[in-house]
């Protein structure tokens, strides 16, 4: 299967560079097995039934971008990919020349780091300040907006590039389907009898990496840390037994749940809790084990995420839906509109 089969041309004007004024003010495309319809996000309450289980990703985006210079004076930009411990991180480092081991960095005029190792494209940096890294980032870091938003981060992004139910710090990109939910709509869903649970997947910067091969089977997926606790496994079993639906909010929730299912299949067991790195790559032909419907935003052309959605709802259905979204001027990507998709697999 070729990457080019997932290509579409998007007018620049349809890239959402700012969120809507209210979280729930986005539009919602409903891609059902019978066709598609155009709704408002608030209509999602009518699409989810009592007894259905909504599963969210409760990761918290850390202000992971730091700007500054090397001791030599050269400009440098650090994007933290993963926190190792309170004083060590794995990071992407952009500079005119890659820093050598022992190179010291002064970031945001206050943060001192030293390059102590390298893992492929990532650098291991040691924080020299006495405070723990999370405290430093909350004080000095910039929100790591995706490259296509193409503007400096603003104070408002600290709230809006974050779900209202975020809990566990560690992501460097938001689980964007969740950005549409506010406390009011969550209460409406719970009052209706919809059940909710939370998984964790710390979204890495790799989520924005383009697929650089022609044949998708040759693509090496980036790795991210995911958690599916036992209470989520139990809630899924209860939902399935009752004949209700498991609905994932976002591709990161999908990947967490399907990673747990894949591990269970490999171990020859029933679905079990999962606390591990995952590099699961879902593309057409994949048979979903857990989810019956999903909420997601509109994704980049030729990305692994549009491949995942195509695996869930059928490639032709998804690519046609994207053309319709462009014709109807939906807003795309992280701060854009959403889709509610029902599983459509042979």
Curated annotation (Swiss-Prot):
It comes from the Bacteria. The keyword Nucleotidyltransferase does not apply. Pfam families: Queuosine_synth. Its EC number is 2.4.99.17. It catalyses: 7-aminomethyl-7-carbaguanosine(34) in tRNA + S-adenosyl-L-methionine = epoxyqueuosine(34) in tRNA + adenine + L-methionine + 2 H(+). Pathway: tRNA modification; tRNA-queuosine biosynthesis. Keywords: Cytoplasm, Queuosine biosynthesis, S-adenosyl-L-methionine, Transferase. The keyword Cytoplasm applies. It is found in: Cytoplasm. Gene3D superfamilies: QueA-like (3.40.1780.10). GO terms for molecular function: S-adenosylmethionine:tRNA ribosyltransferase-isomerase activity. Transfers and isomerizes the ribose moiety from AdoMet to the 7-aminomethyl group of 7-deazaguanine (preQ1-tRNA) to give epoxyqueuosine (oQ-tRNA). Monomer. Belongs to the QueA family. This is S-adenosylmethionine:tRNA ribosyltransferase-isomerase. The lineage of its organism: Bacteria, Pseudomonadati, Pseudomonadota, Gammaproteobacteria, Alteromonadales. The gene is queA.
């Amino acid at each position: 299967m070729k990457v080019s089969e997932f290509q579409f041309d998007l007018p620049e004007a349809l890239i959402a560079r700012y969120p809507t004024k209210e979280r729930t003010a986005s539009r919602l495309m409903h891609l059902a097995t019978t066709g598609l319809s155009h709704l408002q996000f608030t209509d999602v309450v009518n699409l989810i039934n009592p007894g259905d289980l909504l599963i969210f990703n409760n990761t918290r985006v850390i202000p992971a971008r730091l700007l500054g210079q090397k001791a030599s004076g050269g400009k440098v930009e650090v994007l933290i990919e993963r926190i190792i411990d309170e004083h060590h991180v794995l990071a992407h480092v952009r500079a005119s020349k890659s820093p050598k081991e022992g190179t010291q960095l002064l970031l945001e005029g206050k943060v001192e780091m030293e390059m102590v190792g390298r893992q492929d494209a990532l650098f291991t940096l040691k924080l020299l300040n006495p405070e723990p890294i999370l405290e430093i980032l909350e004080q000095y870091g910039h929100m790591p907006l995706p490259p296509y938003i193409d503007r400096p981060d603003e104070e408002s992004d600290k709230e809006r590039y974050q779900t209202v139910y975020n809990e566990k710090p560690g992501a460097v990109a938001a689980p964007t389907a969740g950005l549409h939910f506010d406390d009011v709509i969550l209460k409406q869903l719970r009052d209706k009898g919809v059940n909710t649970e939370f998984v964790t997947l710390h979204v890495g910067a790799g989520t924005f990496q383009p697929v650089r091969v022609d044949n998708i089977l040759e693509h090496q997926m980036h790795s991210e840390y995911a958690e599916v606790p036992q209470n989520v496994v139990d809630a899924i079993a209860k939902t399935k037994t009752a004949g209700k639906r498991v609905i994932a909010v976002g591709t990161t929730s999908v990947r967490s749940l399907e990673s747990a299912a894949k591990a269970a299949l490999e171990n020859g067991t029933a679905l079990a809790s999962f606390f591990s790195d995952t590099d699961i790559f879902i593309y057409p032909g994949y048979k979903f084990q857990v989810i019956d419907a999903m909420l997601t935003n509109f994704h980049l052309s030729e990305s692994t995420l549009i491949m995942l959605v195509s695996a869930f709802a059928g490639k032709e259905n998804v690519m046609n839906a994207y053309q319709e979204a462009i014709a109807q001027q939906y807003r795309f990507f992280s701060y854009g509109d959403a889709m509610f998709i029902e599983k459509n697999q042979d």
